[in-house]
Amino acid sequence: MSASKNRAPQIALAALLAVAVPANADGLQPGYWKIVSTPEVNGAATPPQEKMRCMTPAETSDLDKTFSPDARTINSTCERVAHEATPTTLTWRLTCTGQVSMEVAGAFKFETPQRYVAEVRTQFSLAGQTTSSRVTIVGERVGECP
């Protein structure tokens, strides 16, 4: 029997277990997550940033609250102008006016209970200077919280 035939049952079992892992109603499992953010400012890439985060059952049961921005800022008035949440996606857009004029848009895709990808775009003007940024984010569950 060849090595590839020996691995076939293991691969099938791994695939079955991956599908059989119960998903949270909103798409992600609580646990310890590695989040890699790759920013780009005014078209120039900056080094990726990696952080670890323990996501609680409360956070994963309300992905809208967990991944939506807080509309409160200092010296500006912000309004959520677009918002849509499904069990597998979240999109939103926020505009702010005042000392800082800003627009922030986020698009999250909860691919599996253990992985999500996102893009957050920001454009803001301060003292006549406009800055644009784009951050791509990949979150992967790595295990239970320490």
Regions found by a protein language model. Name each.
Residues 2-12:
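Bacterial N-terminal signal peptides that target proteins for export
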